[in-house]
Amino acid sequence: MKRKVLAMLVPALLVAGAANAAEVYNKDGNKLDLYGKVVGLHYFSDDSGSDGDMSYARIGFKGETQIADQFTGYGQWEFNIGANGPESDKGNTATRLAFAGLGFGQNGTFDYGRNYGVVYDVEAWTDMLPEFGGDTYAGADNFMNGRANGVATYRNNGFFG
């Protein structure tokens, strides 16, 4: 019985992506976090465009600074590195997120840059699966539905009550 469990556990651990985060700096209201994720992924498909190695790694930084009692500045940068192509293929690396913003305490946040559009906030409730999640209408570089460039967003968690 132990061998069967071990035989199932080892492949599951090899397939699962690892996500980690580390606090680089946190002092006097200033905070900087480093995070990352490595995913080994292989698709088996009759479609030659989606068959094969889809492995990738992501690295990012999140920062925040306390400007005043109810006033903060923040930013985030996240980069995707495709591990499934040659170095000459520049199409599999891209900046996923790059934005800066201001937080106004209980009154919400305002940011600008490459970020998720506000429609994604609603769609994110279905984007929970590790693969094929949130595929209803979200996509990268699709205005307000997914990640896009030049997006100004206002978010407030307590707006409707």
Swiss-Prot record:
Keywords associated with the record: Cell outer membrane, Ion transport, Membrane, Porin, Signal, Transmembrane, Transmembrane beta strand, Transport
A Pfam family this chain is assigned to: Porin_1
InterPro entries attached to this UniProt entry: Gram-neg_bact_OMP, Gram_neg_porin_domain, Porin_dom_sf, Porin_gammaproteobac, Porin_Gram-ve
Signal peptide boundaries: 1-21
Main location: membrane
Source domain of life: Bacteria
Cytoplasm recorded as keyword: no
GO CC annotation: cell outer membrane; pore complex
Name of the protein described by the UniProt record: Putative outer membrane protein YedS
Species assigned in the record: Escherichia coli (strain K12)
Gene from which the chain derives: yedS
